Every structure is written in C-alpha cells, then in structure tokens.
Amino acid sequence: MRTAYHEQLSELSERLGEMCGLAGIAMERATQALLQADLVLAEQVISDHEKIATLSARAEESAFVLLALQAPVAGDLRAIVSAIQMVADIDRMGALALHVAKIARRRHPQHALPEEVNGYFAEMGRVAVELGNSAQEVVLSHDPEKAAQIREEDDAMDDLHRHLFTVLMDREWKHGVAAAVDVTLLSRFYERFADHAVEVARRVIFQATGAFP
C-alpha cells in the first residue's frame, strides 16, 4: 500500500516538473512574440495554455486524493501540502506567460515595446526561462541546496525590473503613456513569474528539511 502511495507521490512530482517545463517554454515563446511582434507565436502560447491548466487540475486532484485517502503524517504530509501550493505557483507562472502573449497579440501588427527597452525584456525573458528550468530541476530532484540557489538567480530579475523603472521615469521618455503602461505591466509579469519560481524553490526546501526559508 505504501509503495503505491510513494509511486503516486513520485508521479505528482513528475507532473509538477512537466508543468514547470511548459511554463518556461510558454514564457520563452511569449517573449519572442513580444520582441518580434509575432502573432502566430503569440497565438500558440495562448492556445497551449490549456495544457498547463489541464495538468494543474489533475495535479491538484491527485494531491487532494492522496491527502484524503492516505492520511499522511510528518514528511509525507509536508510533501503533499507543498505540492498543492506548488500547483498554484506554477499555474500562475503559466498564466503570466499567457498575459505577455496577449499583450503581444493585442498590439499586433505594431510592436508592444519601444525599441530602446527591447534589451531589457530580452534579458528578463532569458532569466525567467532559466528560473523556470531551475524550478523544474529542483521539483524533480528535491535538492534543497539547488533550490536555495534559485533565490540568488532571482536577484538578476529584480535588478532588471529596477533599472527599467529608471528608464520609464526619465524625462527623456518620449513614447507616451500607453507604451509606459505596457512596459510597466509587462515588467511586472516577468517579475511575478520569477517570484513564483522562487516560491516553488522555497516549498522544495520545506519539503526536504521541514524548515521554511
């Protein structure tokens, strides 16, 4: 009975890892759509989001079934409760990539971003994908040391977010209010994507150690 239980727990981790991978791919494609005003790619991200939503629902259901039927305690209870919380975090990562793609679609055929901030968003996209990949790795490996490193990787996103705001607040900004709103929203989407990846890492640490960093 316990063997079957631990197999189900392992399957749940694999499903969470798959969700992280899909969220990372979605953000990578959404960033390309944003930078290149690529409507086809934006539409692909939007249509593919259903995969993450389906996996999210299945993972959450699996976790609650384990919780209800197995009455886990101690480490097993931590693992399931953390998994339920991770489902929500990873689901939000996918939703944030979806938001980026929708802005790219809404502004098409124009570019949503002024050319002078493209470099910031190219780098924010790179960091976001890296964080998504790292989150996938620690969800599958349950490695608390690697999970702790993700919090450091997030510093790069925070720095980019701050620097971008100095550009927006500069008197030399000449792209108008609508562009400033888009840039602000998009920057926030990338920052929140990174924050949720960090939350996933924190929950992996809690699963492994019982201490919440």
UniProtKB/Swiss-Prot annotation:
Subcellular location per UniProt equals:
Cytoplasm
The Gene Ontology CC terms held by the record are: cytoplasm
Output one GO BP term: phosphate ion transport
* Gene disruption phenotype: Defective in persistence phenotype shown by increased susceptibility to tuberculosis (TB) drugs rifampicin and pyrazinamide in both minimum inhibitory concentration (MIC) testing and drug exposure assays. The MICs of rifampicin and pyrazinamide decreased 4-fold and 2-fold, respectively. Reduced persistence in the mouse model of TB infection. Mutant was less able to survive and persist in the mouse lungs and spleens as shown by an about 10- to 30-fold decrease in colony forming unit (cfu) counts compared with the virulent strain.
Q: Does the keyword NAD apply?
A: no
Cytoplasm as a keyword of this entry, yes or no, is yes
What family name appears in the similarity comment?
Belongs to the PhoU family.
Assembly? Homodimer.
User: What is the official name of this protein in its record?
Assistant: Phosphate-specific transport system accessory protein PhoU homolog 2
What would be the name of the gene that encodes this protein? Answer: phoU2
